[in-house]
Amino acid sequence: MDTLCSTLLLLTIPSWVLSQITLKESGPTLVKPTQTLTLTCTFSGFSLSTSGVGVGWIRQPPGKALEWLALIYWDDDKRYSPSLKSRLTITKDTSKNQVVLTMTNMDPVDTATYYCAHR
């Protein structure tokens, strides 16, 4: 009976729940001080044209907590970390399913692993 119930429940899950969302970051692994970092997030499994959807960037310096950087919404509304706002630009290209983050005037304190995320 348990197997039958599990099977029936699985069959009633909407198809959108089963779709797979993927995001992949790309860009240079090393940037010299004062240079500009440009990172690209290429995604699939959702549309950045859909109301309520956003893609953001976060980073994690070695041995430290995650830090939120920027977020862009379907309607092109953009939000930035107040402490980094003057150095960040976030843009989207819905035709390519990409979001690009640019960070100017890089410094050794910006050493981190950078991630993009779906909202």
From Swiss-Prot:
Major place of residence: secreted
Pfam family, one: V-set
Region named Framework-3: 79-116
Protein name: Immunoglobulin heavy variable 2-5
KW Signal (keyword) present: yes
Stretches the record annotates as Framework-1: 20-44
Annotated function: V region of the variable domain of immunoglobulin heavy chains that participates in the antigen recognition. Immunoglobulins, also known as antibodies, are membrane-bound or secreted glycoproteins produced by B lymphocytes. In the recognition phase of humoral immunity, the membrane-bound immunoglobulins serve as receptors which, upon binding of a specific antigen, trigger the clonal expansion and differentiation of B lymphocytes into immunoglobulins-secreting plasma cells.
UniProt GO cellular component terms: extracellular region; immunoglobulin complex; plasma membrane
Region called Complementarity-determining-1, residue ranges: 45-54
GO BP term, pick one: immune response
Residues making up the signal peptide according to the UniProt record: 1-19
